[in-house]
Amino acid sequence: MGRDTIAEVLTVIRNANMDGKKMVKIPSSNITENIIKLLLREGFLENVRKHYENGNYFLVLTLRHQKTKKGPVTNILNLKQISRPGRRIYSMSKKIPRILGGIGIVILSTSHGILTDREARLEGIGGEILCYIW
């Protein structure tokens, strides 16, 4: 049975975010690097570093938090995996869902790489819906 790397990444980020942690370390792979680059570009992450340790590469993520008098308030509200190894979900470019009227993002795996819903609509291509972030 293979590992579901997308689910692992989303779960680690979600758990660290709920716990109020500032930094998270996740195993690096091509798909996780591309998803993390999208999250960084969309403003959900503050910083990303690639770290080599014991023969393996890791990504060290700095989560974005808003500080208040009561403590840090999380920036990422929800991460939801849509496509799973046992059930793949695909969408055409015109039927890509909008999350909260465009406030959230949909991450897709397309023939042009990992893209957000806005980029996929602009290019007019569909693909596998990996996750929703809002």
From Swiss-Prot:
Task: Provide an example Pfam family for this protein.
Answer: Ribosomal_S8
SUPFAM superfamilies attached to this UniProt entry: Ribosomal protein S8
Q: Which GO MF terms does the UniProt record name?
A: rRNA binding; structural constituent of ribosome
- Domain of life of the source: Eukaryota
User: What does the UniProt keyword field contain?
Assistant: Plastid, Ribonucleoprotein, Ribosomal protein, RNA-binding, rRNA-binding
Is the keyword Cell wall biogenesis/degradation assigned to this protein? no
Q: Does the keyword Ribonucleoprotein apply?
A: yes
Could you tell me where this protein is found in the cell? Plastid
Q: Which residues form the signal peptide?
A: none
InterPro entries for this protein: Ribosomal_uS8 (IPR000630), Ribosomal_uS8_CS (IPR047863), Ribosomal_uS8_sf (IPR035987)
Q: A GO BP term, please?
A: translation
Q: Which GO terms describe its cellular component?
A: plastid; ribonucleoprotein complex; ribosome
Its annotated function is as follows:
One of the primary rRNA binding proteins, it binds directly to 16S rRNA central domain where it helps coordinate assembly of the platform of the 30S subunit.
Protein family (similarity comment): Belongs to the universal ribosomal protein uS8 family.
Subunit and partners: Part of the 30S ribosomal subunit.
According to UniProt, the name of this protein is Small ribosomal subunit protein uS8c
Species this chain originates from: Cuscuta gronovii (Common dodder)
- Upper lineage ranks? Eukaryota, Viridiplantae, Streptophyta, Embryophyta, Tracheophyta
